[in-house]
């Protein structure tokens, strides 16, 4: 099965594009440092572009819903990846997006203390 022609044309233009690994590394270090300083337990990434963060009460689905409803923060519960009790946060986003997410993570964490 071949991908549609439009997809093939788009991929052809992207063939030489390389990810900005230095930016991803900076985001990883920032997110890990800030979340652990807030009191979150994080599993250090070992080559992936996402960070697993343990939710304080173990209910990753409820945490994700609360983050969206109370702080307009979209996070992925790791139950979707057969790893309940964690969030799976991708850090291959803009540095600004990481910075804008931190106050919400801080506010949510404070509610658990």
Where are these regions (language model features)?
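PLP-dependent class I/II
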Residues: 1-113
